[in-house]
Amino acid sequence: MDVKKLIVVAIEKKVLDLTGKQIEIRLDEPPSINMGDYSTNIAFRLSKELKKAPKIIAEEITSSLSIPGIEKIESLNGYINFFMDYSVFSKETTLEINSKQENFGKSDLKNKKVILEHTSANPNGPFHIGHGRNMVIGDSLKRILNAAGYTVETQYYVNDMGRQEAIVVFGNDRFKLDKSKKSDHAIGQTYVEANKLLNENEELEQEILNLMKNYEEAMENGIENEITEKFKNAVEYALTGFKETLSTLNIHHDKFVWESEFVRSGLVRNVINRLMETGKVTEEDVYRLDLSEFGIEKKLVLARLNGTSLYSTRDVAYHMTKMENCDFAVNLLGADHKLTGIMVNKTLALLGYNEAEIVFYEFISLPEGSMSTRQGRFISMDELFEEAKLRAREEVKKREVAKTEEEIEEIAKKIAVGAVRYNIVRISPEKPMVFRWDEALDFEKVGCPVIQYAHARCSRILENCEPSGLVNSKNLFEYEMAENEKIIVKLISKLPEIVEKSAEVRKPQILANYALELAQGFNKFYGNCRILKEENETVRNSRIMIVNSTKLVLENSLDLLGIEMPGKM
């Protein structure tokens, strides 16, 4: 039962009768359910137009107003407060959740395809924690958009044509790959060694330029040769390691799109030619595109004078292909790429294409001394995860919840994935964040373990009863419910609304914060309401239904954030 929607529809009709206009109704939630479950200030908004006091308007709206699922409607000093009939609402909510199971929270198909690009790190070394923020937010958005009814295709844009990849190929020709290392780490080591060699011998720079030029020419002419093979092997070797890291964090891309595809297909050349014809390109040290009509002072670097393309041009070609194959596109980009992302979008507009939506995220860092790094320069996502798992193992052993080494490992891995993913996704992307272990692995207040532990608590309760036999009970919730019962039922009912809102505004942190609020609400319910030891059978069965429903909603919420439940903690 969508009580909120029923309230809005009923008030809209009353307002239409009073004003002859369709006016958007906004509902607020009072700080305590004792003051009402929902309220509206619509009477204040209409006061000037109707030339009446808000109190009088509120009374006119509420007179003879009846809404299914609402037990009491109160007009108080111009505000209209709605009190739900919790006996009806609780029964319908818990039965719906138990009926829909893993589908509770999901919406009908919207018949819109989304291409969501995330991660897209250069294949020249392992993912660092900055990439981690991109991949976690991106994958969470994919899951949420899917649940909201969109058809989502996730893409990883592989930069196989830039200077950085040419340096990797150059390095592979001179240094032996350390096959004892994970492949992306081995590539990273070669990249560092090659850069050092280039810094010490400036005359070798021409070799990098030649590699880039020869690779692009081969791609443009559809030629497979020794150079193309070297680039392909280097990139694929790095991607093998990338995919391992992504899989560890429950992240999988639908498609890996190579940058060179657009050179090979001729689309990049087509983009350059079309932009040259706009009359907005100037020949300087390179060809530059004037975007001043969009309020951008800096010019987009289009191509080198020798005709070879640049990353920005290939990016435009990639986005043209995206836009031709979806209803809208979403990109995850670091804040340091803000100008570049906007410039690519305006170039698309110049060519008659829709712009991509961009979710920008700020930097992520670790407190100094929180963990050591064997890389010396940055913390890789692999190191971050291993450290999380090590700390989680210690906690699992301390709590004595697992008997075998395999069980300890399985629980620790799920806690570690949850700690890393949740601690990243709960913070708004536009805010810089510091990854703190005391928050990530917090079992008491803000960490994912709080949510996982609430779920484990639900599981333990349900092990001692049979909730499946309760769904047909006719007298569920037919008693005076406690405040903590009402609060938790209201919370579990909100998942569909939360998913819809998170998808609409592209903010997975809304769902993350909801999951924590739900876990905290359940803990209060558990601490204040007897469940299995409750003597009244109706009350006991109703509370078991709340436990089972909460367990399902917690599972569904964390699943949309790419996090699994350990089962016991």
From Swiss-Prot:
Compartments reported by the entry: Cytoplasm
Any matching Pfam family: tRNA-synt_1d
This protein's UniProt keywords: Aminoacyl-tRNA synthetase, ATP-binding, Cytoplasm, Ligase, Nucleotide-binding, Protein biosynthesis
Any one annotated GO CC term: cytoplasm
Annotated motif 'HIGH' region, positions: 121-131
Name listed for the protein in its UniProt record: Arginine--tRNA ligase
Source superkingdom: Archaea
Similarity annotation: Belongs to the class-I aminoacyl-tRNA synthetase family.
Main location: cytoplasm
One term of GO molecular function: ATP binding
